[in-house]
């Protein structure tokens, strides 16, 4: 099924990308796909390799090994010019006016003069920058500079979006605006790859998530797929049970006790009914439920304690 | 989109960014104003300062005609006036209204001056005194007519044969040469520094990362160099043209054709010199990430320019046709400043001009490759200053 999809739907494919800085492997065989029309959340700790991967995609950094393809073809300069990029370290010409800056960048990406002006005005309006359109970028607040930077990534109607921490530094209203913009772009068939530390936002917004740790992809898939891979966790509330009643139950591990509720991770093939029976043996059971781990928990599981 | 369009877009941004800034307009206006001031100063103050005002009093008043003639042969322009009262004359010297007061009989003149007597004026006065003394001595010999002897002596002189026709415009040519040398030096320094600052600005503001996700490093560098170069060329042309027109109108210059030719040569050499220095300035700028570090990294490059300028002033004034001047003026780092100066003096053989241009162009090609490589290797690396060797490795 996946193979068929890969054939039918264009995708941004990151394939076996490696990049070393001295002794540090910033990327070690990083592979994943962002399909057209998909919002892909790229998650990982500081220095895990997100930014390096994105810079490799944009050709700002040359990979030591591996390849990045879009629609089946390895990326070249002409293809990358149709990408939209928000770098981790923001940067615009400080003394250039907002409108001029966006028009200039749109033209550099291949737009004609009129088209560039229309697109720049359009994004200025959409991102709420109208009153600042003639201001120099250096005179804007950081939040507004961030909006201009986003407009710079979007102004040339890119085929592919690669955004490094697009939500950081935005106020809640701007977060909503940007989320809507990203959904709309994905709806138009654009693959959107973005990194974020706001995992609740990623969980809410993204179709798929990739987790990277120390340069290696440790998990990749929809949040439900990640959940499925993390095993079954049950929560048991047995008020009459003595503390430690669940210790040593075959095939289970206690992962936490909270307000008298015991959380148990079940090994593959362990019958949850056996756990329920053991709980009932201690007295009444008020609650017995399967727990749906949040992305935050899945992330902690995936990267372990060592991150 | 073609590479040419990308380069043009980048160049156009530089043009707009510079031409619109107030500092550029003010800078050009100030340069023109300074030039006007210099020309006016030349035509009025310096012109007046060449006249020596001499007051004659008592018996010395008979010298009013002969002093002027005698002084002129020694290159001094004397305006003699009669002063009735020597005391009043001395007061005029003290006040600076007179440069010298001459009193006493012609055979024993006394001179009062402020501090020192101009050497040429002293010789002129000495000659007059000696003539007077000689005339008295000759008058004592009976069979001689003193006037005839003096006339015979006056007619005697060396016979001079010039190998070249005398160049009456020598001083003007030198002035034009020095002005073009100074203008070229300032333009190259200013616009070379601007290239470096522009590179550092893009690096320190990190805008270079989104630019390089779109265009290649060489396109970005070439666009910047072309854009700033055109601004510099326009500024030099405007200042130069205003200078020539003004100097001709005020009759400070009587060789407008030669001056215009010098300006055109100056623009040509500005282009060559700018291309030569711009790649070096850009490469140096790309090694640092903060504006504060720019001056330090540019110091070796600006030192070469300063050296070329100082050498240019000295050599062009003293020996525009000497071997050292000829050699230095064909070497690429110095040629863009020295050669137009020699051309202005009409001291540059066509072969040497062609050689200098060819060498500079070859150096431009070499430095563009080298500078482009350093730039591409260093432009995306932030943090501390990057060692040259690492930048070359890329």
Where are these regions (language model features)?
Chain A
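Conserved N-terminal strand/loop that marks the beginning of ABC ATPase nucleotide-binding domains
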Residues: 1-17
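ABC transporter nucleotide-binding domains
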Residues: 12, 19-213, 219
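A short, local hydrophobic-aromatic micro-motif
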Residues: 15, 64, 138, 253-255, ...
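Structural motif
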Residues: 90, 250-253, 283
């Amino acid at each position: 099924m996946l193979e068929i999809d890969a054939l039918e739907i264009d995708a941004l494919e990151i394939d076996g990308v490696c990049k070393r800085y001295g002794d540090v492997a910033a990327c070690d065989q990083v592979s994943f796909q962002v399909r057209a029309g998909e919002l892909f959340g790229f998650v990982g700790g500081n220095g895990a390799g997100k930014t390096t991967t994105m810079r490799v995609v944009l050709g700002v950094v040359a990979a030591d090994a591996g390849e990045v393809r879009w629609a089946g073809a390895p990326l070249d300069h002409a293809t990358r010019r149709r990408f939209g990029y928000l770098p981790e370290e923001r940067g615009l010409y400080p003394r250039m006016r907002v409108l001029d800056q966006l028009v200039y960048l749109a033209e550099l990406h291949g737009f004609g003069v009129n088209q560039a002006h229309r697109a720049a005005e359009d994004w200025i309006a959409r991102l709420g920058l109208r009153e600042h359109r003639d201001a120099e970028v250096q005179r804007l607040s950081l939040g507004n500079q961030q909006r201009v930077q986003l407009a710079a990534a979007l102004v040339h109607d890119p085929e592919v979006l690669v955004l490094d921490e697009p939500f950081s530094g935005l106020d809640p209203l701007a977060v909503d605006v940007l989320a809507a913009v990203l959904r709309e772009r994905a709806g138009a068939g654009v693959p959107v790859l973005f990194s974020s530390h706001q995992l609740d936002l990623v969980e809410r917004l993204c179709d798929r998530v990739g987790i990277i740790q120390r340069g290696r992809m440790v998990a990749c898939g929809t949040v439900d797929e990640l959940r499925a891979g993390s095993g079954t966790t049950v929560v048991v509330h047995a008020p009459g049970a003595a503390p430690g009643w669940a210790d040593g139950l075959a095939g289970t591990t206690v992962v936490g006790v909270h307000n008298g509720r015991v959380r148990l991770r079940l090994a593959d093939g362990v019958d949850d009914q056996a756990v329920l029976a053991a709980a009932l043996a201690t007295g009444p059971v008020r609650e017995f439920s399967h727990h749906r781990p949040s992305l935050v928990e899945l992330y902690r599981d995936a990267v372990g304690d060592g991150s | 989109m073609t590479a040419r369009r990308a380069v043009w877009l980048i160049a156009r941004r530089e043009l707009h960014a510079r031409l619109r800034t107030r500092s550029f307009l003010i800078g050009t206006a100030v340069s023109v104003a300074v030039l006007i001031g210099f020309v006016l100063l030349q035509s009025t103050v310096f012109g007046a300062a060449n006249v020596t005002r001499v007051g004659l009093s008592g018996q010395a008043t008979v010298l009013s005609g002969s002093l002027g003639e005698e002084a002129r042969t020694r290159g001094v322009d004397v305006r003699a006036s009669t002063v009735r009262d020597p005391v009043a004359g001395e007061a005029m010297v003290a006040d600076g209204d007179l440069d010298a007061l001459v009193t006493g009989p012609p055979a024993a003149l006394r001179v009062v001056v402020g501090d020192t007597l101009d050497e040429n004026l002293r010789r002129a006065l000495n000659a007059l005194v000696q003539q007077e003394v000689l005339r008295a001595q000759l008058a004592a010999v009976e069979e001689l007519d003193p006037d005839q002897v003096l006339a015979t002596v006056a007619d005697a002189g060396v016979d001079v044969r010039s190998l070249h026709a005398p160049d009456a415009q020598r001083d003007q040519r030198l002035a034009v040469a020095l002005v073009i040398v100074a203008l070229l030096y300032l333009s190259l320094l200013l616009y070379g520094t601007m290239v470096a600052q522009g590179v550092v600005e893009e690096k320190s503001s990190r805008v270079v990362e989104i630019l390089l996700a779109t265009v290649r490093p060489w396109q970005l560098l070439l666009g910047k160099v072309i854009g700033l170069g055109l601004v510099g060329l326009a500024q030099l042309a405007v200042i130069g043209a205003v200078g020539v027109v003004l100097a001709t109108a005020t009759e400070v210059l009587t060789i407008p054709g030669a001056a215009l030719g010098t300006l055109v040569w100056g623009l040509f050499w500005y282009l060559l010199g700018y291309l030569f220095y711009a790649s070096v300035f850009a490469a140096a700028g790309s090694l640092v990430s903060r504006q504060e570090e720019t001056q330090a990294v540019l110091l070796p490059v600006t030192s070469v320019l300063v050296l070329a300028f100082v050498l240019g002033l000295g050599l062009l004034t003293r020996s525009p046709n000497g071997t050292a001047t000829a050699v230095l003026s064909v070497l690429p780092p110095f040629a863009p400043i020295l050669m137009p100066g020699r051309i202005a003096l009409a001291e540059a053989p066509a072969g040497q001009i062609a050689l200098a241009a060819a060498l500079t162009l070859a150096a431009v090609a070499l430095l563009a490759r080298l500078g482009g490589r350093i730039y591409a290797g260093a432009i995306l690396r932030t943090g501390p200053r990057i060692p040259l060797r690492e930048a070359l490795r890329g």
